[in-house]
Structures are given as structure tokens and as C-alpha cells.
From Swiss-Prot:
<feature type="binding site">
    <location>
        <position position="7"/>
    </location>
    <ligand>
        <name>Zn(2+)</name>
    </ligand>
</feature>
<keyword id="KW-0677">Repeat</keyword>
<dbReference type="InterPro" id="IPR023486">
    <property type="entry name" value="TFIIB_CS"/>
</dbReference>
<keyword id="KW-0479">Metal-binding</keyword>
<dbReference type="InterPro" id="IPR013137">
    <property type="entry name" value="Znf_TFIIB"/>
</dbReference>
<dbReference type="GO" id="GO:0070897">
    <property type="term" value="P:transcription preinitiation complex assembly"/>
</dbReference>
<dbReference type="InterPro" id="IPR023484">
    <property type="entry name" value="TFIIB_arc"/>
</dbReference>
<dbReference type="GO" id="GO:0097550">
    <property type="term" value="C:transcription preinitiation complex"/>
</dbReference>
<dbReference type="GO" id="GO:0017025">
    <property type="term" value="F:TBP-class protein binding"/>
</dbReference>
<feature type="binding site">
    <location>
        <position position="26"/>
    </location>
    <ligand>
        <name>Zn(2+)</name>
    </ligand>
</feature>
<dbReference type="GO" id="GO:0003700">
    <property type="term" value="F:DNA-binding transcription factor activity"/>
</dbReference>
<feature type="repeat" description="2">
    <location>
        <begin position="210"/>
        <end position="291"/>
    </location>
</feature>
<feature type="binding site">
    <location>
        <position position="29"/>
    </location>
    <ligand>
        <name>Zn(2+)</name>
    </ligand>
</feature>
<keyword id="KW-0804">Transcription</keyword>
<keyword id="KW-0863">Zinc-finger</keyword>
<dbReference type="InterPro" id="IPR013150">
    <property type="entry name" value="TFIIB_cyclin"/>
</dbReference>
<dbReference type="InterPro" id="IPR036915">
    <property type="entry name" value="Cyclin-like_sf"/>
</dbReference>
Length: 300
């Protein structure tokens, strides 16, 4: 980068711009001429004209989380307007809002995505999971899978599917807790969506170990207990003891066993509450793991 300015150290008029640091530097002596320079160019790089044309855009990027993908334009608000002009602008904004969701399909999609936003917020889901749930829902709409089903149930099912696909541990109970429909309805919609969107058991498989840190955090268990629980679960998996079992129930039992073995005892009730399973489930999985893996567990 060259310009009319002169380096105060060496007198050079040749400079280079460092975009990673936002600095203009003297090419000869390295003196920093200017700091915190804002690069107003695009955030992407292109290596040929075709790539540049493909990546160039005006306005904000598309978002699958918005019913119109963010491609519409909003009428702005000017607080300096008074009287009749302000009323006119208010009416225009109102009509624009109506026209953007002018048919039933658009209204339903807008409602579904607002419900998705609410669920994702309550479940503290990362954005990539929310986007995957939106993609699944749009695909379900495209294939006509929503007809006759509750929008809330289908969007909750898509959230659950996205969590499992991306290995972000959230149980069906957790999702049902923040949804407006019950667990059974979400479960039915999930199985229906999974079948018709080719979400195979292999794709949806969640290793029980994925839940260990989540539950252990809530139980206040040490790293030593977590490692022991993971060892138990990995051995159970290798011996085929996890097939067809609820991951939450297995993790609860493994953490219960590990807490006893490492002297950080938690009760069956405590781990059952955290894992959102019954004490009977914890007890049954506990017996299976201890017997089949021949574990030496101190008497609780």
C-alpha cells in the first residue's frame, strides 16, 4: 500500500496493510503508522472472477432461520416524523408485515421458526443445531409431512433430531419440558420424520458417553468419576450391552457406579433426577452393568 504519508522513522513512503492486525506498517523499517484500521472490504476471499461473482452480495447473508431467508426489505422507522406522515409509515409497515406472510404456508413457516427460536433459546442450543433443525423442518414441509400434525410437535421433533445428528446431548424429556406439546406427541412426530427423511438409526446414534459430562456437571462429580464412567460405558458398548437401551439410563447407572467406586457417592434418586429417568431404570441398568462387566462396587 502506498500513499502521500511519510514514515516518521525512516522517511519511506511505501506502506503495507496487515488485515489480521488492522495495521498500516512501513514497508522499509516496520514502524506501525496506523492501528485499528477497519477493513471495509468483503469478509470472504475470491481467487478468480467466477468465484468473486458467486460470493459477492448486497445486504445481509441469507438465513435459513428466517421464513423469507432474510431476503426481504423492511420499511425503516424515522422517529423524527410527526403527525400524518408517522401514521402513514406505521400503516405501510403493518401492510408490509402482512404481505410478507400473505399465505397460510408462509404464516405457518414463520410461526414454526419463531417456535424453533424459542426452543433453541430455552435449551441453550448452538446456532448450527438450530440451523439443522430449520433445514429438517423445511425439508419436511417440502415433502408434505406436516399435514395433519401439530407444528409445535414437528418443530420439537426436528430439534431432537438435529441434536442427535450433531451429537449435542439433549434428552427427549428436556425438549418436552420446554415445548408446548407432550413427550409422546413429540416422539411420534420424531419417528415419522426420521422415517420419511431417511434419518437412519446409524445417523441418529448418540453414544452414551456424549451425555457423561452434561450429567456429571449437574451432579458436581470430579474428572476421575467421569473417566471411570466412560470406561464402564465403553466396555459395555464393546460387549453389546448398550443396544436398544436408553443412553440417559445407561449414563445414569454408569455415573452412579463410578461415584461409588471413586468415593463420591450420589444416590440413585439424584442421578435419576438429573438424567430424567426413573430410579427403577437406574437400578436395572446398575444390576446389568455390575453383573455383566463383573464390577467390584462398594456396598452403597
Amino acid at each position: 500500500m502506498s500513499g502521500k504519508r511519510v514514515c516518521p522513522v525512516c522517511g519511506s513512503t511505501e506502506f503495507i496493510y496487515d488485515p489480521s492486525r488492522g495495521e498500516i506498517v512501513c514497508k522499509v523499517c516496520g514502524y506501525v503508522i496506523e492501528e485499528n484500521v477497519v477493513d471495509e472490504g468483503p469478509e470472504w476471499r475470491a481467487f478468480d472472477p467466477g468465484q468473486r461473482e458467486k460470493r459477492a452480495r448486497v445486504g445481509a447473508p441469507e438465513s435459513i432461520l428466517l421464513h423469507d431467508k432474510g431476503l426481504s426489505t423492511d420499511i425503516g422507522i424515522d422517529r423524527s416524523l410527526t403527525g400524518l406522515m408517522r401514521e402513514k409509515m406505521y400503516r405501510l409497515r403493518k401492510w408490509q408485515s402482512r404481505l410478507r406472510v400473505s399465505d397460510a404456508a408462509e404464516r405457518n413457516l414463520a410461526f414454526a421458526l419463531s417456535e424453533l427460536d424459542r426452543l433453541a433459546s430455552n435449551l441453550s442450543l448452538p446456532k448450527h443445531v438450530e440451523e439443522e433443525a430449520a433445514r429438517l423442518y423445511r425439508e419436511a414441509v417440502r415433502k408434505g409431512l406436516i399435514r395433519g400434525r401439530s407444528i409445535e410437535a414437528v418443530i420439537a421433533a426436528c430439534v431432537y433430531a438435529a441434536c442427535r445428528l450433531l451429537k449435542v446431548p439433549r434428552t427427549l424429556d428436556e425438549i418436552a419440558d420446554v415445548s408446548r406439546v407432550d413427550k409422546k406427541e413429540i416422539g411420534r412426530s420424531f419417528r415419522f420424520i426420521a422415517r420419511h427423511l431417511n434419518l437412519t438409526p446409524k445417523k441418529l446414534f448418540v453414544k452414551p458417553t456424549d451425555y457423561v459430562n452434561k450429567f456429571a456437571d449437574e451432579l458436581g462429580l470430579s474428572e476421575k468419576v467421569r473417566r471411570r464412567a466412560i470406561e464402564i460405558l465403553e466396555e459395555a458398548y464393546q460387549r453389546g450391552l448398550t443396544s436398544g437401551k436408553s443412553p440417559a439410563g445407561l449414563v445414569a447407572a454408569a455415573l452412579y457406579i463410578a461415584s461409588l467406586m471413586e468415593g463420591e457417592k450420589r444416590t440413585q434418586r439424584e442421578v435419576a433426577e438429573v438424567a430424567r429417568v426413573t430410579e427403577v431404570t437406574v437400578r436395572n441398568r446398575y444390576k446389568e452393568l455390575v453383573e455383566k462387566l463383573n464390577l467390584k462396587v462398594p456396598i452403597a
